[in-house]
Structures are given as C-alpha cells and as structure tokens.
Amino acid sequence: MEGVLVVLLSLVLVVLSVLILAVARLVRATRVDKVPDPAPVVPRTPAARGVGDVTGPADFDEEPTVRVLPAPWEGSGAPATTDADSPADRDGTAARTGDSAVTAGRSDGGLRAAHGGSAEEAAQIVARAEREAAERLARAERDAAEIRRRGEEDVALLRERMLAEAAVETSRVQAAARESVRAEQEAARTEIAATRAAFDGEQQAWRTELQSREVAIAAREQRVEDRMASLDDHGRRLADRDRDLLDRENDLTRRTAEVADLERARHAALEQVAGLTAGQARGELIAVIEQEARREAALTVREIEARAEEEGEERARRIVTTAIQRVASDQTTESVVTVLHLPGDEMKGRIIGREGRNIRAFESVTGVNVLIDDTPEAVLLSCFDPVRREVGRITLAALVSDGRIHPHRIEEEYARAQLEVAERCVRAGEDALLETGISEMHPELVNLLGQLRYRTSYGQNVLAHLIESAHLAGIMAAELRMPLPLAKRAALLHDLGKALTHEIEGSHALIGADVARRYGEDEQVVHAIEAHHNEVAPRSICAVLTQAADQISGGRPGARRDSLESYVKRLERIEQIAGDRPGVDKVFAMQAGREVRVMVVPEEIDDLAAHLLARDVARQIEEELTYPGQIRVTVVRETRAVGTAR
C-alpha cells in the first residue's frame, strides 16, 4: 500500500507542475497582448530634425518621431491610440481622452506654427510631444507593472488552489488506501479467525474422538479382564471336573475289570455246558443272520430296481414322445445341386462364352460346377460345400440379371456375393436366436451359428437340426422341472464346431466347446457341447438332455442320409490334402470329386514345382482315400499383367 501511495503522490505532483507551467505561459501571453501598439509615425521635417538633434530626449535609443495628429476637419475628440484591452486603460479612459484632446490641439497649433515658419515654436511643440510621449510611456509601464502584479497574484491564488486540491486529493487517496488496507486487514483477521475456528473445531473433534476411543479401549480392557476372570473361573471348574472324571474313570476301570472277570467266568461256565467256545457260537449266529439279511436285501433291491426301471422307461418314453409330438419339423435333407432358372435358353450361350471362357472363369473363381443340359431355361450348380454353392448361385443370378458376363465381371459379382452370404449368415443366426427364445449371445457365436445354415450333416441342415434340438431340449427340460434357457442354449450350440472343422483340426464337439468357452459361455453349456458325443463323460443333466435332443432330431425318419455325409467328407478331405501344401491359394473339388483344381501363387510355385505338386497330391489321395474310378489333379498357375490407359 505504501508503494501505491507514493505512486499516487508522484502523479499529483506531476499534474500540479504541468498546471503551473500552463498558467505561467498564459500570463506571459496576456502581458504581451496588453502592451499598447505604437502609433504610426512620420519622418520629421528638416527643420524639426535639426532641432531634435539638439533638444531630443536622451531616454530613447531610436530616432525621435512626431505623431501625426488628426486634421482639424477629422475631429479633435478621437485619441491618437487606444488600448481597450488593458484594465488600467479602462479605468483612466476619461483622463486619457482629455489629454489626447489637448495633445491634438497642441499638435495642431504646432503644425500651424510650423507652417507659419517659426522654428522656435516647432521646437517647443516637439519638446511637448516628447514629454507627452515620456508620460505615456511611464503610464504604460505602470499599467504593465500593475498587470504583472495582478497576474502574479492570480498565479499565486491558482497555485494555492491547486495545492489545496492536490492536498484534498492526496488525503482522499490516502484515506481510500487506508480504508483498503483496513479492509484487507479485516479480511485477513476474519480468515485467520475462521482458520483458527476450523482448527479448533478439528482439534475438538480429534479430542472427542480420542476420548471416545479411550472410553472404548477402557471398556474393551474391562471386558477382557472380565473374560479373563471368567476363563480363570471356568478353568478352575474344569480342573475340578477333570479330577472328578479321573476318579470316576478309575472307578469305572475297576468295575470294568470286575465285570470282565465275571463275564469270563460266565463264558467258561456256558462253554462247559454247551460244548462250544464263544467265538464259534458268535460266528454261527452271525452267518445265519447275514444269510437271511442278504436274501431279504436282494429281494428288496430287485423289486426296487424293477419298479424304478419300469417307471424310468415309462417316464422317459412319455417325455420323449411329448417332445417329438410338440415339435413338427420339416424335411431337412438337402442335396448338392441347385437349379437356377434363366430368362431364356439364349442365356446359356452367354454363360458358356466364347470357347467356354466364361464358364471356365466362373468355375475357377467360385469352385462350383455349372451343368448345362437340355433342361429348358435352367442350369444346374453342383458343389458339395453349401456355402460355396450359395455364393455361386448368387453370383450367376446377378450375372444373368445384369446380362454382362465376362471374367472380370464374374470376379466382381463373386466378391459381392461373398459379402451378401456373410450378411445372410448373421441374419440366420439372429433368426435362430429369436426362434428359440435365446438372447444375449456373443456376436461371433451368432455369426458362426448363422454359417451353419449352409452346412449339412448326413444331408440334414445343421442350423435346422440345432433349432429342432433346442426345442426338444426345452420341452424335455420343462417336463423335468429344469431351467429351460440353459438346456436350449446347450442344444442350440452343441454342433457349433461344425462351422470351423474346415479351418481347425479336431472333433467338432471339442472345437465347439473351446470356442464357446472362449466367448464366455456358461461352463454347463460348454460341458454339454463337449460331451454330446461321449468324448467327455457327461456329468450333468443338461449334457444328457443335449445328447437326447441330438439323437431324437437326427434319428427320426428321413432326417439324414449317411451316403451324402461320407461323400461330403471325402471331398473335404481331398481339398484339405491339396490345401495343406505351401504356395497353394485355392483348392476346388470338381465333378463330384473326380477332379481337383489347385490354384497356386505364381510367385512361389514355378512350372516345375507345379508338376511336382500335382504328382504329390495325387499320390497322397491314393494312399489315404478310397474312391471309385480316377481323380484328376489339375494345378493352375496363372500370371496376370494389368495396365491402365489414361
């Protein structure tokens, strides 16, 4: 605050200095403006100049001059000069007016005398004019001194007024500063008081808490002391009881010995009477009783087992019959051929293309055989893999609808068809969840579940089989008073591994269980998946229900065909044998397994390696598989050079 006061005082002093300088300049300017302007002069006549050289006043440094007075006809009442701006002139206006008139008369007379030719009179006139000029000059100096004095008084008054205002302003600033300092001090005191009060409150709280803790500790110590006293008393009572028990034990030991002696004497007497020892008599009695008990127990167990078996079979038959009656499933057997209808027979030629270029490109890209026969307005698509067959069907349908069929267009539509089939798989999985009433499943599991829409097991659609199994398991779980969601979930996911058998080696049950465990399924569901083919012993009712639902869905009449499943497995193994080789890009089993087309990467497989690859694949197929006829292995190595014209 002291620094602020010093700065404010310095500013006030600077302002006062500036005001004083401005007033001084104003006074000097006023003094210059108030000096009378010199009257116009004319040169003296030769006669007057001669006289003036002798009688001129010694106070003037310049050459004496004679004022030109107005002519008689111009009026003698006007003064020669006026200075209305000076306050002294305003005060003596009348006197100066009279003097001017006299001077004018004298000047007029002087002029007339000069015109008359009297030199002496002219000299007198000049002398009077000079005296008058000296008087006017003295009067002007007195007026100037008076003006200077008044100006100095005004400056002094102004300085005093400014100093007083500065003192008042300084006092006000000091008072404001003191008030600000006082307010800050008061705020600091208030803050210190609040801090001190808070600190005192915290100290009081700590004291209260310490006191309460001390009271609690004292109470606990008192309880401990009471407990110790109670334990001591209890220990004394236990010691007394131990002594009493020891005495009783000694007494019982003595009595037991006496009873044993009496018992031995009695047994000896009985043995003498019966002719048998005690051990022999006991053995005979136990043998008789044991034989009777075993016979009765065997009869009871046989009766219970027969009754339980009859009731169990009856109840199981009723549960399974009820489940089958309540589930009405469609025929789920599927073939490996898809029929695509054409708008006209001329479209067959466009599908074949020039020299079969289009149909070869289609089969190479999709891995689906196109069978064109005499059937009007229809072509057949044949492939053991339902996913690949569906992708080929969508691709060919799009090409036929568009009308532009060439190898580049086939590749574009094939990529678009793959995306569409992937979306259909997701929708199929979601529809399966909605149909079975299951919610909150991991998206990857839903995707794998939807892929089973295009998988078959012995000719039966796997997704339809899973949905049917889920319904059967739910019905049987309801009959057994079990949780329905858990049984349905296990039955719906038990064949999940079939969606990955082409990618991962192993049993589909173990693969599905591992995938379900990885995506957070319940351990009971995982166990039911891995145990539905008895690869793991079932340990829960949910696993047994899953097995039952699987057998019911797959064992009903018309559900499966074993020959189709073995055929599909043989084709999958053929593709796997070729696909495991390094440098292989794609593998397609064509012509119902009689031809295998292997697409290789041209940068990794040259022409010589392609021949060796075809021979090795053919030899491995001969060693591992059993098949009718012959299988031709074709290795395709294609190099493309693409240029863009702009």
UniProtKB/Swiss-Prot annotation:
Membrane topology: Single-pass membrane protein
PANTHER family for this protein: RIBONUCLEASE Y
Gene Ontology CC, one term: plasma membrane
Organism (species): Frankia casuarinae (strain DSM 45818 / CECT 9043 / HFP020203 / CcI3)
CDD domains according to UniProt: HDc (cd00077), KH-I_RNaseY (cd22431)
E.C. numbers: 3.1.-.-
Protein name in UniProt: Ribonuclease Y
GO MF entries: RNA binding; RNA endonuclease activity
A Pfam family the protein falls into: RNase_Y_N
TM spans (from-to): 4-24
Record region (Disordered): 43-62, 69-118
Cited InterPro entries: HD/PDEase_dom, HD_domain, HDIG_dom, KH_dom, KH_dom_type_1, KH_dom_type_1_sf, Ribonuclease_Y, RNase_Y_N
Gene (name only): rny
The family this protein is said to belong to: Belongs to the RNase Y family.
